UniProtKB/Swiss-Prot annotation:
InterPro entries according to UniProt: UPF0390
Function according to Swiss-Prot or TrEMBL: May have a potential role in hypercalcemia of malignancy.
Listed name of the protein: Leydig cell tumor 10 kDa protein homolog
Biased composition (Low complexity): 7-18
Region annotation Disordered: where it falls in the sequence: 1-40
Length: 94
């Protein structure tokens, strides 16, 4: 047996968020370790910006193609955020 008392007793987290974080357990999926070398960081930043640009260009091309073939004007809708979905007035949670 160990001698003496433990220095720090285990305590419950003070906030609900911290308690939920602790009880959640391990997350699914692989982990990516951020690179330390400046050149690799710069390459990843460039890659990400290029991917975003390519995705936006493809979306724009699809919208233009669809709007040119439709008789009525095409309107794009933004996806609702999680907070606005939870607090829609007049709707009851089911």
């Amino acid at each position: 047996m160990a001698q003496g008392q433990r220095k720090f007793q285990a305590q419950k987290p003070k906030s609900k968020a911290a308690a939920a974080e602790r009880s959640r357990g391990p997350r699914k999926g692989g982990r990516v370790i951020a690179p330390k070398k400046a050149r690799v960081v710069q390459q990843q930043k460039l890659k990400k910006s290029l991917e975003v640009g390519i995705r936006k260009k493809i979306e724009h091309d699809v919208v233009m193609k669809a709007s040119s073939s439709l008789p009525k004007r095409l309107a794009l809708l933004k996806g609702a955020s999680k907070k606005s979905e939870a607090t829609i007035p007049g709707k009851t949670p089911s």
